[in-house]
């Protein structure tokens, strides 16, 4: 049985009861969002997330490919990408496309971030402006790190303060790396924002989300707004029962 939590006006959480339910919810949400966009606007413009959890979701989506109304109408961008000598080994693009090739999305509708180009961020922003109507994605997938980062928007990095650019290179000193990432201005205007969290290693993060006083705001908490909240999908193992108990009863609802 999933639990719906209204954490605040900008963040709504759905906690799955099992790993299977987590993947089902994430998969059906993705497919229904795609079908709605294709029906209404003729295409589904999505920014994908890197990380292990999205790869599991992609596998489920491919299994349920028949439920997608028209895979040829999917247009794929990325939310962030590594920019170092190990990019091929750790590339979000390569890992995702190894799975998503099963959807047979036209190659000219898949836009990879070119992190080898010193002006690749400007070029990627231009691609978004050219191909995504009004630069509004139908969906942006958001992973969440233990430190509360999302995409490559890490705590105490300069990209957090970007007000105009849609794509930037972001120096991440805590990881000794440089990443290309979408920024808040374009992410916040997406039609559907979804954050995915699973694993016991995220329990401390969930505790801090539930108890926000006395700490800095996490990057992921700066994404949603009351007019466009982030929908979180969490697995039960990412939340301690004691923290769930601390959430007021009128903010929780057992769904199904």
Swiss-Prot record:
Its EC number is 3.1.1.31. Keywords: Hydrolase. Pfam families: Glucosamine_iso (PF01182). One of its GO terms (molecular function) is 6-phosphogluconolactonase activity. Transmembrane segments: none annotated. Pathway: Carbohydrate degradation; pentose phosphate pathway; D-ribulose 5-phosphate from D-glucose 6-phosphate (oxidative stage): step 2/3. NCBIfam families: pgl. This is 6-phosphogluconolactonase. The lineage of its organism: Bacteria, Pseudomonadati, Chlamydiota, Chlamydiia, Chlamydiales. The gene is pgl.
């Amino acid at each position: 049985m999933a639990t719906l939590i209204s954490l605040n006006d900008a963040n709504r959480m759905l906690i799955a009861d099992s790993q299977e339910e987590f993947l089902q919810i994430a998969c059906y949400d993705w497919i229904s969002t795609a079908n709605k966009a294709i029906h209404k606007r003729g295409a589904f413009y999505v920014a994908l997330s890197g990380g292990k959890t999205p790869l599991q979701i992609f596998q489920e989506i491919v299994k349920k490919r028949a439920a997608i109304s028209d895979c040829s109408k999917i247009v794929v961008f990325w939310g962030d990408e590594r920019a170092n000598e190990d990019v091929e080994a750790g590339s979000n693009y390569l890992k995702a496309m190894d799975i998503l090739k099963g959807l047979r999305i036209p190659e000219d509708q898949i836009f990879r971030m070119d992190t080898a180009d010193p002006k690749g961020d400007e070029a990627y922003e231009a691609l978004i402006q050219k191909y995504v109507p009004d630069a509004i994605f139908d969906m942006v997938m958001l992973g969440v790190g233990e430190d509360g980062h999302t995409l490559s928007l890490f705590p105490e990095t300069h990209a957090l303060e970007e007000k105009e650019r849609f794509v930037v290179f972001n120096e991440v000193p805590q990881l000794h790396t440089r990443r290309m990432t979408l920024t808040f201005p374009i992410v916040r205007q997406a039609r559907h924002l979804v954050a995915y969290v699973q694993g016991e290693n995220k329990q401390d993060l969930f505790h801090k989300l539930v108890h926000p006083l006395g700490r800095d705001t996490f990057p992921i908490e700066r994404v949603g707004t009351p007019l466009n909240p982030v929908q979180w999908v969490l697995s039960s193992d990412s939340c301690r029962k004691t923290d769930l108990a601390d959430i007021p009863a009128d903010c929780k609802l057992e769904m199904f």
